[in-house]
Amino acid sequence: AIVGDVIPNERRASAMGIIMASFSLASVIGVPIGLYLATLSDWHFPFFVLGGLALTALVPIYFYIPKINAHIDSKEDRENPIEIISKVFKNKNQLLALGFGVIIMLSHFSIVPFISPYMVANVGFTEEQLSYIYLIGGALTIFTSPLIGKFADRYGRQKIFAITVLMASIPVFFITQMGETPIALVLLVTTLFFIFGAGRMIPSTTMVTSSVKPKNRGSFMSFNSASRQMTNGFAAYIAGLIITEDANGLLQNYELVGYFAIIMGMISIYVGSRIKVVDQNDFEN
């Protein structure tokens, strides 16, 4: 919501790309550091450090994040949460944006929770080798995320979103079909999934942010975030019902989940194409 209010629409995807890259950087650096800190004391210690860093971050946030209160200073009464949710379901564009986010999460989080167990059970990875998947994939997205953001601003969010979804479908297909495979080939496929799977979140988040007027953006994005979190759990639950384990310990039916994820991705392209950008300077309903 802050990015949507502060960054002009023509540069918003680039800003989202940088933010996504910072998440990747935090993961690549933070996870090893967290594990190391745990060895120095116990598992509580990394969380104390994280809390301390969060408190420290409040200082630059206070001084450098601009105040965004133009839409609050109006004399209108504040809406209660029920009214906010009701307005979302009455606004076709916001409803499309909400459904768009849900469909993307169904596509993404039906696959992600089972990558690690599938790699160990079916592909031949050891528990120690799993870290290579996230280390290499996360490291490369540090560089690719800003590029995808710039492309989205230059060539259009819907077009770049469609391209990243189509490209992400390729590694999704192979990841969910793999048997025992050389580690280098597996890392190539999983890295492509990280690049394009995370990459599609950049134009899609920008599209959702731009679908709401500044006055309603914060409340809508909170509702959108909650719906996505619920969908994440639902997607993993559905995938868990489909995937089974045979007598040899191999996971079965992961390919069916892959087909489901690809279909959801195709549907998201269509739904995303119908989302409209609202006037970013209009603070009225």
Question: Which residue ranges define each predicted feature?
Answer:
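Helix-loop-helix hairpin linking two adjacent transmembrane segments in secondary transporters
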Residues: 18-65
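Cytoplasmic helix-loop-helix junction between adjacent transmembrane helices
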Residues: 1-22
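Helix-to-loop junctions at the C-terminal end of transmembrane segments
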Residues: 145-156, 243
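Juxtamembrane intracellular "pre-TM" segments in multi-pass secondary transporters
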Residues: 66-98
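Extracytoplasmic gate region of multi-pass secondary transporters
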Residues: 94-134
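C-terminal transmembrane helical hairpin of 12-TM major facilitator-type secondary transporters
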Residues: 158-203
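Multi-pass alpha-helical transporter architecture, strongest
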Residues: 60-62, 259-285
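A membrane-interface helix-boundary motif in multi-pass transporters
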Residues: 39-51, 243-263
